[in-house]
Regions:
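Hydrophobic alpha-helical segments
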Residues: 99, 123-126, 136, 151-155
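Histidine/acidic-residue-rich catalytic or RNA/ligand-binding cores of hydrolases
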Residues: 76-85, 103-119, 136-150, 170-171
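Short hydrophobic "helix-edge" motifs at membrane interfaces and signal-peptide entry regions
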Residues: 59-60, 120-125
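His/Asp/Glu-enriched short active-site or ligand-binding loop at hydrolase and phosphoryl-transfer sites
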Residues: 92-105
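Short secondary-structure boundary segments
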Residues: 31, 95-98, 131-132
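Short acidic/histidine-rich active-site segments
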Residues: 125-140, 159
Length: 175
């Protein structure tokens, strides 16, 4: 069983307690606008540094396996620090198909995903793919991210979701 959690603040607080998280097989942590606020005076959903800090802090949680849609430009992030943090904590970074849809609501996702993929390739950091289907016909749809992966010449061996065995092994490395 798994869940997508809301990152609530730059401390990496999520909306489920550890005693629940430890019972899950998979936990994805994501920033979602309505749930996220920083303790800063900055009102524009935090700064690049605070958003990056939120991701880095949540990656320290041994029950969080994946960072969901970190390509959303509404929440700017330092991708060098994000990728380094993912490597250090064995956390997967999601390449999200829904983010890349032309009619999507997230901003600058293609540019951000390209930067993230390039850094992951350089640092040997694994990504995971997600359809993030908001309607049933999109479940398992990856057409937008397949294009990005090809354009980035991203190595298949760094894509966690190419086999169940690989994905399962990488998830178990966390913690």
């Amino acid at each position: 069983m798994g869940a997508e959690l809301n990152i609530l603040d730059e401390l990496g607080t999520v909306d489920l307690p550890d005693f629940v998280l430890q019972s899950l097989d998979l936990a994805i942590a994501s920033i979602h606008g309505p749930c996220y606020s920083t303790n800063s005076e900055i009102t524009e959903k935090g700064s690049r540094d605070l958003n990056t800090q939120a991701y880095l802090n949540v990656m320290k949680n041994p029950y969080i396996h994946i960072i969901g849609h970190p390509d959303d430009g509404r929440f700017p992030v330092d991708y060098e620090r994000l990728v380094r943090g993912a490597k250090e904590t064995h956390t997967l970074l999601e390449l999200n198909n829904s983010s890349q849809r032309p009619e999507g609501f997230r901003v600058n996702t293609e540019e951000n995903a390209k930067v993230m993929l390039e850094l992951c390739k350089k640092e040997g950091v694994y990504i995971t793919t997600g359809s993030d289907a908001h309607i049933d016909i999109d479940v398992g749809g990856f057409s937008c991210i397949e294009k990005l992966i090809q354009e980035a010449d991203f190595p298949e061996e760094l894509i966690a979701t190419t086999s169940y065995e690989k994905f399962s092994r990488l998830i178990r490395q966390k913690g």
